[in-house]
Amino acid sequence: MLKFTLHKKDGLARRGTLELNHGKIETPVFMPVGTYGSVKAMNPQNLHDIKAQIILGNTYHLWLRPGLEVIGQFGGLHGFIGWDKPILTDSGGFQVFSLSDMRKLTEEGCTFKSPINGDKLFLSPEISMKIQTVLNSDIAMQLDECTPGEATREQARKSLQMSLRWAERSKKAFEDLKNPNALFGIVQGAMYEDLREESLRGLEQFDFPGLAVGGLSVGEPKPEMYRMLRAVGPILPEHKPHYLMGVGTPEDLVYGVAHGIDMFDCVMPTRNARNGWLFTRFGDLKIKNAKHKLDKRPIDESCTCYACQNFSRAYLHHLHRTGEILGAQLNTIHNLHFYQVIMAEMREAVEQGKFADWQARFHENRARGTD
């Protein structure tokens, strides 16, 4: 089930509501990444506290460990991990295609060696849909070929055409399995504007309830990613949710919303938190730096997260330096809270028709830097 309601537009920025089997989501939305069924350093209560509306699970990793037999015993991923709100799962394709020296790609699918035990495995659109059906994610993704950013035009066209054939197979398998959830298609085309449009037009025939933009944030220069967003954002169908996969920095989220994107996911806030890199309204802060050793201030005095309301930079500096697990947890709570606040502020700005003003203030504040 998926129902998308577009409430308001301000330029290309959109304010909507997405209704799924496990709940309602206000968009634009950021989805914390729970690769193995957990958002690193966070438990479900932490996620509720920061007002996370939906999380992402990784089909490939969950298929390998703990496997479908285990997760199936719990009725799906929600029951297994103790999370009662919506979940989106990727198709597993990105991870498989990352194993370039361990896989063989054909029209049927991809054969690869398990990086865990060396077993020979095969992933096809049909198998990806079966896995995601067992996971019972609210939003599943079609299996696509993840086109590298540096692909030639001919390589990119050949790749997107196979992804379109896989989109058709994914949709048929999804329907044959009587999956009650939603399946998104994925727009590919590398760094070629006309190929992106060709991919989008090809997907129209399958009438997916939502569309994702894939193949960005895969190593291409930032201006190239933004160029593709400027090209693709305005031509995505207005009545469907738009998902930008694997992006990104706070600035990327704002740029994406400004160009019509509704949904984002990225490991950046959690990964950076574990490395002591914290996001704030006034730029980024490296908590491991010696200047924070005696600093009694919170990470961000304007922040209402648990870490900022209760602990000093000095304590967080100490936790990071000593490798304490609590440090990673508090840093992650802060970074994910910051991302959720950005999204909430953008939703409000679009509602009020003041997105451009909010965007200008956001960039001005971020450029100011922390002290």
From Swiss-Prot:
Protein name: Queuine tRNA-ribosyltransferase
Origin organism lineage: Bacteria, Pseudomonadati, Pseudomonadota, Betaproteobacteria, Neisseriales
Cofactor(s) annotated in UniProt: Zn(2+)
Family under the similarity heading: Belongs to the queuine tRNA-ribosyltransferase family.
Active site annotation, chain numbering: D90, D265
Reaction catalyzed: 7-aminomethyl-7-carbaguanine + guanosine(34) in tRNA = 7-aminomethyl-7-carbaguanosine(34) in tRNA + guanine
Subunit structure: Homodimer. Within each dimer, one monomer is responsible for RNA recognition and catalysis, while the other monomer binds to the replacement base PreQ1.
Signal peptide: none
GO biological process: queuosine biosynthetic process; tRNA-guanine transglycosylation
Domain of life per record: Bacteria
Record: residues binding Zn(2+): C303, C305, C308, H334
Gene name of the record: tgt
Presence of the UniProt keyword tRNA processing in the record: yes
Gene Ontology molecular-function annotations: metal ion binding; tRNA-guanosine(34) queuine transglycosylase activity
Species: Neisseria meningitidis serogroup B (strain ATCC BAA-335 / MC58)
